[in-house]
Structures are given as structure tokens and as C-alpha cells.
A protein has these predicted regions:
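A contiguous, surface-oriented mixed alpha/beta subdomain in the mid-to-C-terminal portion of proteins
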Residues: 200-358, 368-373
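Hydrophobic/aromatic-lined pockets within catalytic cores
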Residues: 79, 93, 312, 316, ...
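Structured, contiguous alpha/beta core segments that scaffold functional sites
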Residues: 2-280, 385
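C-terminal anchoring/interaction modules
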Residues: 2-3, 7, 350, 354, ...
């Protein structure tokens, strides 16, 4: 909670207020009115993708080893970001995913998961984090027998990506984290269980999400939504100036009074604010007035529109592809086809190629992704395979 003190003085000079005691009223004494603006706010903390060695062999991703968890939280809390990612996942997965093998095409592991489910999961991680991980398990004969999707936020790596560490919870201190260590997948080795790891960043240990330049924009949309939620929680009530006329308390007592008002009468965030005034007597007190606040609707509308546009720009995507209309309401089939063709070439097909090449490297099988189509009709030349 941020507290701002402001002093309104009746003349240029005033008698200093004695700290840590209630100030008595004296005749003809010039008394300052001390206003404490109770400004509740959500602390914006944009986590940076720093990399630093730990004593356990893996490289920490983020100062507290929580950068991927931060990205995941933005994905879950920012509707525009989630819409872009989920829509693009649909485009990448296409209408059908097939492996040129009867057994593999029916299931990829003992959970009876289909190839399409694996492609959907790893394409989502590529879009969220810039990388993905697959647990490759060999059978007793030494051949690849199962593939398991590993949520990328649960993986950490050593510096050169030859050893990987899996944990369901990296939030604990390094010494208390329980993890499983895996070697890097090598088609020429017979490791019983290993990790295939893909990163779009070949110079660092960890990848870079394609929307990393728009993290601040995602944070803006999240915070604006929090503001409106807190406005609802506060009943859209206007701010008030509350005058307490029994003297000016010391700072400790003033803080306690503030906390009591906040706990009982306000919600969290910036949706509603209280301003509390302390004065020696009624003669020197401020009047109790409802404080007019600016209509924030229009102010935040332009802000959130710009934030959304930055997110679409980061993905090189057109909002109309994801059901979000733009100022130009006209978007006919021809325009849709042209827009999708461009997005398909610049974003969708490159990721499809990464996935098919990766699965081909692991399985030594041909992987085919039939492109996304609204009418379920695809030209043979559009099929992505490796």
C-alpha cells in the first residue's frame, strides 16, 4: 500500500507537529491538515528472463527461477494473449496429424494419447515459451516405445542443454526442490528415459517467446482488467474525504486507522480510494465531501486497445483471424483468405516444420500435418510432412 502525505497550511508558516503524540489545540495556533491518501494498488513486477547458475547443476531461469511460471500466468490472465495462442495452436495442429506407422498413429504412450494431442501441447509451448520438451521412453528392446509431453515450465537445463531437470514445483528454494534428472535424447544411445529439448534460442540456455517484446503490453491488459474488477468489488463507489476531528494522532496510530478503514470498507486494487484527514478540531477540519473522479472508461479503452495491438504485432497476426474485430468492420472471405495465407506462411508453417522435423528425428517416421481449413478441404501441396 502506497501512502502519500500532503500538508495544507493556512498560512506560509505553521507550527511543527510534534511526532509520536496527539497535537493539542492552542488559541490562534496555525494547524496543518494532514491528508493521507490511501492509494491501494497492484504491484506490477515484470519478471526478467535472466539466467544464472545454481549449485545444483541447472541454470536458473529468472531471478527466482520462475520466469516460465510468470509467462504462464500472463497466458492464463490475459484474454488477448490466450486467444492468439489458442487460435494459433488450432492452425498449427491442423485438421489431422498422422504418423506413417499403424501403431504410432493409434497411440503414442500407455495413456492412449494420440499424435494430435502431442502436437497440440508442444505447439502451445512453442508459442508460450519458445521451446518444448518431450520425454522419450525406450522399450526393453532399446527402441523408442513411448512419447510423453512435458510441460515446459517444469523443465530446467544445464548450461549446454545436455542434462535436464524435471520438477512439478520450482517455487521452493533451490535446496528444497525435488526433481528428476534426465539425459538429453540421443537416437544413437539406448537411455531408458531421456528428454528431447527444443529451444528457438541457440545462444542461451533457455528460449525466447516470440511475444517477449510485448510482455509489458500483456501486463497492461492484465492490470486494466484488475482495475475494473476492483471497481466492481467496490461497488463503483466514488472516493470520499473522511475527516476525523479528535486530534492528529501519531504516525503509528494513523496507520492503524488507515488499515482498519481499508479492511472494513474497501476491496483490493485501485477500484476505490479513501482519503483520510486528521485535524485538531472541527474548525480546522476539511469538509466531508464526495470526491469526483475522472471517468476512467475512455482513458483505459485506448490504453487496452494499444496493448492488444502490440500483442498482435508481436505475433505478426491480424485480430480478425481470432474473432476480434478491428475499426475496419469489413472483412470478407477474400480478405480472410489473404490474411490467413500470410499468417500461415510467416508463423504457422515454420512451427509445423519444427514439430515434424523433431518427431521425425525421434521416431525416424514420416509425420504429416494436414493444414487447418474451415471447409475441411486441403490441397495436397499444402500438407506439411517430414
Amino acid at each position: 500500500m502506497q501512502v502519500t502525505d500532503a500538508h495544507i497550511i493556512e498560512e506560509q508558516k505553521s507550527t511543527p507537529v510534534v511526532k509520536n503524540q496527539t497535537t493539542p489545540v492552542a488559541e490562534n495556533q496555525l494547524t496543518p491538515l494532514i491528508f493521507r491518501a490511501v492509494n491501494q494498488y497492484l504491484d506490477i513486477n515484470i519478471i526478467q528472463p535472466t539466467e544464472s547458475d545454481s549449485t545444483k547443476g541447472f541454470v536458473k531461469w529468472g531471478e527466482n527461477n520462475d520466469y516460465p511460471q510468470y509467462l504462464d500466468s500472463l497466458y492464463r490472465d490475459v484474454a488477448t494473449l490466450q486467444s492468439i495462442i489458442e487460435g494459433t495452436v488450432d492452425f498449427i495442429t491442423g485438421n489431422e496429424v498422422r504418423i506413417d506407422d499403424v501403431v504410432w498413429n493409434e497411440k503414442i504412450n500407455d495413456k492412449d494419447e494420440l499424435p494430435e494431442e502431442l502436437v497440440r501441447s508442444i505447439s502451445r509451448d512453442i508459442l508460450k515459451y519458445g521451446g518444448f520438451a518431450i520425454n522419450v521412453v525406450r522399450n526393453r528392446g532399446g527402441r523408442v516405445g513411448s512419447l510423453y509431453y512435458i510441460p515446459f515450465e517444469r523443465i530446467r537445463s544445464n548450461e549446454n542443454n545436455t542434462e535436464f531437470y524435471y520438477s512439478k514445483d520450482w517455487s521452493k528454494s533451490v535446496g528444497r526442490v525435488k526433481y528428476i534428472k534426465y539425459p538429453k535424447f540421443d537416437p544413437n544411445k539406448k537411455d531408458g528415459s531421456s528428454i528431447f529439448y527444443y529451444s528457438n534460442n541457440k545462444t542461451n540456455t533457455y528460449p525466447t517467446p516470440i511475444w517477449s517484446a510485448a510482455c509489458k503490453s500483456a501486463e497492461i491488459e492484465k492490470q486494466v482488467n484488475e482495475y475494473h474488477l476492483n471497481s466492481i468489488a467496490n461497488g463503483f463507489s466514488a472516493s470520499y474525504l473522511i475527516s476525523l476531528n479528535n486530534g492528529i494522532p501519531n504516525e503509528e496510530i494513523a496507520d492503524e486507522i488507515e488499515d482498519s478503514f481499508i479492511e472494513k470498507f474497501t476491496g483490493s486494487g485501485n477500484g476505490g480510494r479513501l482519503v483520510i484527514s486528521f485535524a485538531n478540531d472541527k474548525e480546522h477540519s476539511a469538509e466531508l465531501n464526495k470526491l469526483d473522479v475522472d471517468d476512467s472508461g475512455e482513458r483505459y479503452k485506448s490504453l487496452i486497445e494499444r496493448a492488444r495491438q502490440q500483442l498482435f504485432t508481436a505475433f505478426r497476426a491480424n485480430p480478425n483471424l481470432f474473432g476480434i474485430p478491428t475499426e475496419n468492420n469489413g472483412f470478407n472471405q477474400e480478405e480472410y483468405d489473404k490474411t490467413f495465407k500470410l499468417y500461415n506462411r510467416t508463423t504457422v508453417r515454420p512451427i509445423q516444420k519444427i514439430i515434424t522435423q523433431s518427431l521425425n528425428y525421434i521416431l525416424d517416421k514420416t509425420i504429416t500435418i494436414t493444414p487447418f481449413s474451415l471447409d475441411d478441404e486441403n490441397k495436397e501441396s499444402d500438407v506439411i510432412q517430414k
